[in-house]
């Protein structure tokens, strides 16, 4: 069986406060994009062990012993949801340490497949506590993360054209969040009434990623890349996703995004 494990991007990301456990409460409008890892999975009938390997451009920085796939399989067995062991091959097309959530997406894709999309709230909470709080994002193609435990699905869909850029910088999520000093007041996205795509785009233009200025300060290359993207014809706005370092631009149409990509590839070979 081959699974597609999609990347996410944060269309907005606001840091609301720091919790007593050291985590930060955030809000985010997000969506999944057409960038994915391919996961090939089959039962390992010869050995009582999981055989996990990663291939592809972005595989070399992933630990074979300490990764989201292995942790997911162990958690499923620990909770009696599976008993078998598996051979899993992941072709990594999603950059790591980039803000795309590739590891979390891999975990959710695997868990959904092995449980046939049937998990109870108790396991769902364990999964998010032990594997990562952003796993819940991958249960909707798009949504509004209201707080660390609540996601509101966005039912209305718009055709958005993205240019994705990875500047080959590995950002530490822990380090980036440790430098947060200012907080943004909570908002309720669902109170907004967007009658058409332009209204939604204009709203997003006025949003931001609170972590972006922190990362730009350490890596000026990211600030320059974002400006290069936003200066391209047809670009509504550019932004960093998650805690970086990946950036994106939202374009008015596919041709504009492809033309921008062609020019950026010449500047950033």
Q: Where does each model-flagged region fall?
A:
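Short hydrophobic/aromatic beta-strand micro-patches
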Residues: 248-250
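ATP-binding N-lobe of GHMP and related small-molecule kinases
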Residues: 1-98, 116-122, 166-169
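Phosphate-handling active-site elements
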Residues: 78-87, 113-131, 253-264
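Short secondary-structure junctions
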Residues: 79-84, 231-235, 266-269
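Conserved, helical-rich catalytic subdomain that frames metal- and/or nucleotide-binding sites
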Residues: 50-54, 138-237, 252-265
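Glycine-rich beta-strand-to-loop/alpha-helix junction loops that act as flexible
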Residues: 100-103, 240-245
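DPxDG-like acidic metal-binding loop motif
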Residues: 98-124, 137
């Amino acid at each position: 069986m081959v699974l597609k494990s999609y990347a996410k991007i944060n269309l907005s990301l606001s840091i609301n406060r720091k919790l007593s456990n050291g985590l930060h409460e955030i809000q985010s409008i997000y969506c999944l994009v057409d960038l994915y890892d391919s996961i090939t999975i089959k039962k390992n009938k010869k050995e009582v062990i999981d055989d996990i390997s990663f291939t592809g451009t972005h595989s070399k920085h992933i630990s074979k012993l300490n990764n989201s796939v292995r942790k997911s399989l162990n958690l499923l067995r620990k909770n009696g949801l599976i008993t078998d062991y598996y051979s899993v091959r992941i072709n990594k097309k999603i950059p790591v340490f980039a803000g795309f959530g590739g590891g979390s997406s891999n975990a959710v894709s695997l868990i959904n497949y092995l449980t046939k999309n049937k998990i109870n709230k108790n396991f769902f909470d364990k999964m998010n506590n032990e594997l990562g709080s952003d796993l819940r994002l991958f249960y909707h193609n798009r949504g509004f993360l209201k707080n660390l435990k609540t996601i509101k699905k966005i039912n209305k869909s718009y055709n958005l054209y993205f240019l994705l850029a990875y500047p080959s910088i590995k950002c530490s999520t822990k380090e980036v969040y440790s430098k947060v000093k200012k907080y943004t007041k909570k908002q309720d996205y669902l109170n907004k009434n967007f009658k058409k795509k332009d209204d939604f785009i204009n709203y997003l233009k006025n949003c931001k990623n609170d972590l972006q200025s922190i990362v730009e300060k350490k890596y000026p290359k990211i600030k320059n890349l974002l400006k290069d993207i936003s200066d391209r014809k047809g670009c509504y706005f550019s932004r960093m996703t998650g805690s970086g370092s990946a950036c994106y631009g939202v374009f008015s149409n596919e041709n504009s995004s492809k033309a921008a990509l062609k020019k950026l590839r010449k500047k950033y070979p």
